[in-house]
Amino acid sequence: EQDRYQAIASDFTALSPQEREATLIVAGTNEARHSINEMVRKRMRLEGGLKYTVLENVDATRAQLKQPATYAPDLVVSYHREGQNIQRGVDYAVVGVEGDQVVLRGSDGQNVTVKPAQHFSATLHKKYDIEIAPGDLLKITKSDKQLGLLNGDRVRVQAVSAEAVTVKTERGTIVAIPAQRPMNLQHGYATTIHSSQGLTSNRVLIEATVRVAHTLGMT
């Protein structure tokens, strides 16, 4: 597997900057996506990077989201609907479980309690650290109306600091993404088959097997 990932990273970085802009790497799994993204970044020798905490979606069924035990400490949850004590689209850190309730902490530092059996229309995220450097390609994983960013946007890093990651969108706008809290983004060189649906690209490098690759409808 690692040899296959290295071959794809090599093929991608051998392209001209213009060709890379029009090329999408499609991976079969999140593990493959992580590995290929790291290999591409090493080959590109990006400098001046800083470490940031980002959020990645955790797969959970509707039945699992109704169970308090699903909400492990250090996970982050965002709700798709307003409810008692909770706001739609806000990221809440999981503090712990008390009986049939989950204790969450909002951005204001205040704790709230939620019953998952009643409020299960949600997305779980896990936190992990990545390095981001000027020149990096990132993919936005959650829309932010305030910043003018859309889920799926591919953005190019212009500058990094302890306070923010400044990016340029494909629409040409410059946006400073605050870095004080975990950010909803990931490296954007490789994406999974699921996340690639709806994207268009002039060139596609496929890590996955032919069996799953034929489901792609990109041009």
Predicted feature residues:
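A short beta-strand element within the Helicase C-terminal
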Residues: 199-209
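Conserved SF2 helicase motif VI
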Residues: 189-197, 214-219
